[in-house]
């Protein structure tokens, strides 16, 4: 019975497919549905899995939806941080050990939303070296701030046990951030070629590039800020 329930969950749970040199394809349900007014030569109704194409080249005139512009501008979905063997050139994960908590940070997958800096500047000190002070606030405050990180670049450990995901389970959701990436929460599965989550990354939440300029595609690396990407969604 449990296996059947698991199968149903996998079918009903949304997924995001990254199409090579093309858009993201958000599939809300993996169960094929009959297409109205369409049949095969035997008169049998045809079924398909339906989804929504989301722009990731940054040039669609109908953001966040894809309008085919990626093929006109020659968009490339190549991840420039991988070598010929699809292995990361380098990982930038660092550990900042405090008295009660250790904060882990991977710069490679940071979307530069600056939630941590704005929320807890006594711990996350942009421009300082080291830029993280794990003793700069109460442990509970640090946990709350780390769990707000949209990209999954931040995580924490207490007594040698690492925590990468929020304490409460969240419903699957894709949020279009203003002038920024797609923020994914709730453990939506990401499928496609050459997908490499960074060291220590969360599978529950991550940020996907939609400006087209990230070097770490499909993940956001903050390039939308450098190129002044604009979308008021």
Provide a role label for each language-model segment.
Residues 53-57, 64-69, 118-123, 134, ...:
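A structural feature that tracks compact, well-ordered secondary-structure segments
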Residues 55-56, 60-63, 73-80:
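Hydrophobic, ordered structural segments
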Residues 4-29, 166-168, 173-176, 186-187:
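Short helix-coil boundary/hinge micro-motifs
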Residues 31-37, 122-133, 189-193:
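Short recognition patches in nucleic-acid-associated and regulatory proteins
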Residues 99-113, 172-195:
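Surface-exposed interaction/gating patches
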Residues 20, 42-56, 91-112, 124-144, ...:
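Ferredoxin-like iron-sulfur electron-transfer modules
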